[in-house]
């Protein structure tokens, strides 16, 4: 249902970024979603890389351009360019390493400093399959997400649990906001937003108003 399509066969192009500490599984989340692949020998990402995948929202094809960068301090110089134009983000921590959750607040600040105030953000607790090593409760993370007005989901890139759901939910929310704004303006969403054009997701009220289950299919 629209999972893997021709490169130019899409109605919308949304830039989504992955952020969070090094070693939390960002690269494996990306490879699991875009290639259904998982690497047990996943080294820290050097520089920046991105991958794409298209999904279907209503009768439209939404192409996600998902960017991945290492969470290590020495790559901080690329942040401005990395975040520029992003309309969605997955902020990832490792449920077995509390320090990665403690750093979420700093990553969130950096994300908001470098993007539009209304970017759609999903807090992601990865490595949920390591139940016996869990250091952050679901309740603690959920409370943080509610306080910061972000979405929240726990995933396992290893077991392919909730990975598609996390990415699809972010894309769904972006699509809904963009469609709603185009309709309010009296425009056809597709013609109003040519391929490759920067998407402005509008006011925060729009974001909070559409926090409902996703409508898109992977």
From Swiss-Prot:
GO MF entry, a single one: GTP binding
Family, as annotated: Belongs to the small GTPase superfamily. Rab family.
Protein name: Ras-related protein RABA1i
Record has Lipoprotein as a keyword: yes
NADP found in the keyword field: no
Keywords, comma-separated and alphabetical: Cell membrane, GTP-binding, Lipoprotein, Membrane, Nucleotide-binding, Prenylation, Protein transport, Transport
Sequence positions that bind GTP: 20-27, 68-72, 126-129, 156-157
Record localization: Cell membrane
Cystine pairings recorded for this chain: none
Domain of life, per lineage: Eukaryota
Topology in the lipid bilayer: Lipid-anchor
Function text: Intracellular vesicle trafficking and protein transport.
CDD domains membership: Rab11_like (cd01868)
BP term (GO), one: cell wall biogenesis
Motif interval(s): Effector region: 42-50
Lipidation (S-geranylgeranyl cysteine): 215-216
Entry GO CC: plasma membrane
Listed InterPro entries: P-loop_NTPase, Rab_GTPases_membrane_traffic, Small_GTP-bd, Small_GTPase
